[in-house]
């Protein structure tokens, strides 16, 4: 008779610190697995606490509560399958990132994370102790090896588990999204399968946490490297995977394969889910934003409507004497197509009042960016008042290009609690708007069709803080600016390297200077979803005071 083993993969969305709620989700998955005849129900890395916890796991009281919650969960796991779930483990030897296996009312095994990532968004070397490579776990007919997340990115752990008799690799993860990550995971895990000859189940969590998105997209590889099962990206899923022992090895029975979305859709889904979860997990259900008639605020409004429904999106137009009729018309047109509320609050009176109050202080000076920024800051004051009064989170709308070079006003258009575009360059803003106009998915809560007026996409970008202003008065064309920024930020290239690629040296050096002198602004900027390898927060940590410039 052929040996069989059923694993329920629970690709779910935990909340950091919500121990009881996360345990309840785990038990619901366990009950679903029990009803389906599973032998093991698996949840992702650090699921009980949520992930990433950052310094929360350095707090003894939190670790105490997490350990108590795990013990209480174990007591419930009776008369059914084993439950594998991530959570911290503390003993006299240290504090570990562990994957616990619970069965028959007790803890039957733990796999401790061996390789602690200390790059990009991770600082696990300061949070956890390095665990030894755990022995394979025997569950019924199968010997299960458990490399925890980063462990699968190195050949030694999987190799040691295979040498110790593991027959299947179960990899629980908290692997955050960035562009290209889905393909990279397949390459890395495919290498582990090729090295060991073992099938591999890759289980990732899903959901937003602060600036990070966990995109799910879990999968199962057979010993020949073929994909047997592929779970959806960016949504919860509970899937039952059947393993069968053949003459030579265990193999997964092929089942549903959900094709991953394309690059633009992945980024867009990340922005929508990031906003959705940041609000939900923070206790908000509505947003407010300044709708200028420009492309950035238009895209943020649509992202918000797709995440929350248009009825929970409050748009506010805040015109001054410099606001064009075209911008007024475009903002109204977008709100109408979206079905969102639009209010208009004039700022000309407040602007005149502030400038009048400052007249004796500024006497003898020529108007400059100071007066322009008063307009932006007045808008921030008004929007924050609406946010406070109605309990709606204020969204800020600056794209990565603007945030990179400081083309934004601190305490003005930077005011807000979350920025969906923080890691999206301006050229990609245009691409994303065109894509959204041509695309609709069942998970989008806003209407289908050409929801962003073409006039908004086609007109030259402008802050409209003075007569006849365009962004290109102060910046190179966005195609040039973004190409230079990607080389400086994501590529860490030198000035010489960028010039060798065909860019003007003076322009490159100016952009480099703007990037460095804007660090203090970014330090005070709202969080936003990480889409690239170098988002402006944990990925890229530069000093605010920095006199060095590349002289190459």
Swiss-Prot record:
Family under the similarity heading: In the C-terminal section; belongs to the NAD synthetase family.
Keyword field: ATP-binding, Hydrolase, Ligase, NAD, Nucleotide-binding
Documented EC number(s): 6.3.5.1
Sequence positions that bind ATP: 290-297, 397
UniProt binding sites for deamido-NAD(+): 373, 402, 521
Lineage: Bacteria, Pseudomonadati, Pseudomonadota, Alphaproteobacteria, Rhodobacterales
Stretch list, region Ligase: 275-552
Record-given protein name: Glutamine-dependent NAD(+) synthetase
Active site: 45, 113, 149
Coiled coil feature spans: none
Reactions performed catalytically: deamido-NAD(+) + L-glutamine + ATP + H2O = L-glutamate + AMP + diphosphate + NAD(+) + H(+)
Binding site for L-glutamine: 175, 181
InterPro entries: C-N_Hydrolase, C-N_Hydrolase_sf, Gln-dep_NAD_synthase, NAD/GMP_synthase, NAD_synthase, Rossmann-like_a/b/a_fold
Pfam families associated with the record: CN_hydrolase (PF00795), NAD_synthase (PF02540)
Pathway where it operates: Cofactor biosynthesis; NAD(+) biosynthesis; NAD(+) from deamido-NAD(+) (L-Gln route): step 1/1
């Amino acid at each position: 008779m052929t040996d069989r083993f059923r694993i329920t993969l629970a690709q779910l969305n935990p909340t950091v610190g919500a121990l009881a709620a996360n345990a309840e989700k785990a038990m619901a998955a366990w009950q679903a697995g029990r009803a389906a005849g599973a032998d093991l129900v698996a949840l992702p890395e650090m699921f009980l606490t949520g992930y990433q916890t950052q310094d929360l796991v350095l707090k003894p009281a939190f670790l105490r509560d997490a350990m108590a919650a795990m013990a209480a969960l174990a007591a419930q796991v009776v008369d059914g399958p084993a439950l594998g779930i991530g959570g911290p483990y503390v003993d006299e030897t240290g504090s570990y990132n562990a994957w616990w296996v619970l069965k028959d009312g007790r803890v039957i095994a733990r796999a401790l994370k061996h390789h602690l990532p200390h790059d990009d968004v991770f600082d696990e070397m300061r949070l956890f102790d390095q665990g030894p490579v755990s022995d394979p776990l025997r569950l019924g007919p199968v010997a299960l090896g458990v490399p925890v997340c980063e462990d699968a990115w190195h050949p030694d752990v999987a190799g040691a588990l295979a040498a110790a008799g593991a027959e299947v690799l179960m990899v629980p993860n908290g692997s955050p999204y960035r562009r290209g990550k889905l393909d990279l995971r397949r390459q890395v895990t495919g290498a582990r399968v090729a090295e060991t000859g073992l099938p591999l189940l890759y289980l990732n969590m899903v959901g937003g946490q602060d600036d990070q998105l966990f995109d799910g997209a879990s999968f199962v590889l057979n010993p020949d490297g073929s994909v047997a099962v592929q779970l959806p990206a960016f949504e919860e899923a509970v899937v039952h995977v059947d393993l069968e022992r053949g003459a030579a090895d265990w193999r997964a029975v092929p089942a549903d394969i959900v094709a991953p979305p394309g690059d633009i859709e992945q980024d867009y889904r990340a922005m929508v889910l990031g906003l959705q979860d940041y609000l939900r997990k923070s206790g908000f259900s509505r947003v407010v934003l300044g709708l200028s008639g420009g492309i950035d605020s238009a895209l943020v409004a649509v992202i918000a409507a797709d995440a929350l429904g248009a009825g929970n999106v409050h748009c506010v137009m805040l015109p001054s004497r410099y606001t064009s009729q075209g911008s007024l018309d475009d903002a109204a047109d977008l709100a109408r197509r979206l079905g969102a509320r639009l209010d208009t609050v004039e700022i000309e009176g407040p602007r005149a009042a502030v400038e009048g109050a400052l007249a004796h202080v500024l006497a003898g000076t020529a108007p400059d960016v100071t007066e322009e920024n008063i307009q932006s800051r007045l808008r921030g004051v008004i929007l924050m008042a609406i946010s406070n009064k109605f309990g709606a989170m204020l969204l800020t709308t600056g794209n990565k290009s603007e945030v990179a070079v400081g083309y934004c006003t601190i305490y003005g258009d930077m005011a807000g609690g979350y920025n969906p575009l923080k890691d999206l360059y301006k050229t990609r803003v245009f691409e994303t708007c065109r894509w959204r106009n041509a695309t609709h998915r069942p998970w989008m809560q806003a209407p289908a069709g050409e929801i962003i007026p073409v006039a908004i996409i086609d007109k030259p970008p402008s802050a409209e803080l003075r007569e006849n202003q365009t962004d290109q008065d102060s910046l190179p064309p966005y195609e040039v600016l973004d190409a230079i920024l990607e080389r400086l930020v994501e590529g860490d290239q030198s000035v010489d390297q960028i010039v060798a690629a065909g860019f003007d040296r003076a322009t490159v050096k100016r952009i480099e200077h703007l990037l460095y002198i804007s660090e203090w602004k970014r330090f005070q900027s709202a969080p936003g979803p990480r889409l690239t390898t170098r988002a402006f927060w944990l990925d890229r940590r530069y000093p605010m005071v920095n006199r060095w410039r590349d002289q190459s």
